[in-house]
Regions:
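N-terminal active-site segment of His-dependent metallophosphoesterases
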Residues: 1-61, 67, 173
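Acidic/histidine-rich helix-loop elements
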Residues: 8-27, 52-54, 94-111, 136-144, ...
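His/Asp/Glu-enriched short active-site or ligand-binding loop at hydrolase and phosphoryl-transfer sites
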Residues: 223-233
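Active-site-proximal beta-strand elements of phosphoester/diester hydrolases
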Residues: 2-14, 124-134, 163-165, 218-225, ...
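Extended active-site neighborhood of metal-dependent phosphoesterases/phosphodiesterases
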Residues: 56-149, 189, 193-195, 216, ...
Length: 283
């Protein structure tokens, strides 16, 4: 069995609190402390929006905290880019995102210019990170070249199968219409590549709320955010962000299972913002 601790959306910045006034460093510290007793972890994954301001300094802080957690357990820590990240800052701190227990790079980076995608193997599990970042935009895109690279990597099965990690979920949710404009565009193209391969699960972030779905025949899991989570009890067509760091443990024995964990924060559920995602107007 391979067990993954799946984090996302740490949103740490060089200057302290994020653009909503939330201390991402404190949220990450609290979460890592509260999950310290989870046994038999093999890997930590952070699926994007590592730095709220895209800075190297923000990525450095996350690498330091997550890296220390991973080093204590002798396990790798692997990161993908998100829409808040900037490739230059991400690469300066994290390389292409695949780091061993000692912080040294592991695996291979894609040979596609400028993209921070890569592949490594952990206890027979192939871990592939994709770069869905579109600078200056909220939505994600995987171009044809990156999809062809992914197909080539998946052409040969791995001993324990594969997981794919990217920031933008390749799913639409009819009940939340605005999501279509912010998730991965043309998700069916990814589904076509994954069909018939050994991929066990697709792990994503971006939405700050736990959510399951599928792309083609493959399960998709969206982990809750570390810095804030989205409270779906907000008024119609509005998004409410509240305090309360979360994460997921992914067990890849038999059918993949996903269970969420929440930091023991007495301020959890405190409202941070309410806004209209289509216009950006605060309520």
């Amino acid at each position: 069995m391979t067990r993954v601790l799946h984090l996302s959306d740490t949103h740490v910045s060089r200057t302290g609190p994020d653009e909503d006034g939330v201390d991402g460093v404190a949220a990450l510290r609290q979460l890592l402390y509260d999950v310290r007793h989870i046994p038999a972890l093999d890997l930590v994954v952070v699926s994007g929006d590592v730095a709220d301001d895209g800075s190297r300094e923000g990525c450095d802080v996350v690498r330091s905290l997550v890296g220390a957690f991973a080093a204590e357990r002798g396990i790798p820590h692997i990161y993908s880019t998100g829409n808040h990240d900037r490739r230059e800052g991400f690469a300066a701190a994290l390389g292409f995102g695949h780091l061993g227990p000692d912080g040294a790079p592991i695996g291979r980076r894609t040979d596609l210019d400028g993209l921070l995608a890569g592949v490594s193997e952990v206890n027979g599990l192939r871990v592939i990170t994709l770069d869905s970042l579109v600078p200056g935009e909220t939505h994600g895109v995987l171009g044809r070249d990156q999809l062809d690279w992914l197909a080539a990597e998946l052409a040969t099965p791995a001993p324990a199968g594969s997981i794919v990690v990217l920031h933008h979920p390749p799913i639409f949710v009819d009940a939340i219409p605005y999501l279509e404009s912010v998730v991965l565009q043309e998700p069916w193209a990814l589904g076509d590549v994954l069909a018939g391969t050994d991929v066990r699960a697709v792990l994503c972030g971006h939405l700050h709320h736990q959510l399951s779905g599928s792309v083609g025949e493959k399960p998709v899991w969206v982990t809750p955010g570390v810095v804030t989570r989205i409270d779906l009890t907000a008024p119609s067509a509005h998004a409410r962000g509240v305090l309360g760091a979360g994460a997921t443990v992914v067990d890849l024995s038999g059918s993949p299972t996903f269970y969420t964990l929440h930091a023991r924060d007495p301020r959890a559920n405190t409202e941070v913002y309410v806004y209209d995602p289509l216009t950006g107007a605060l309520s």
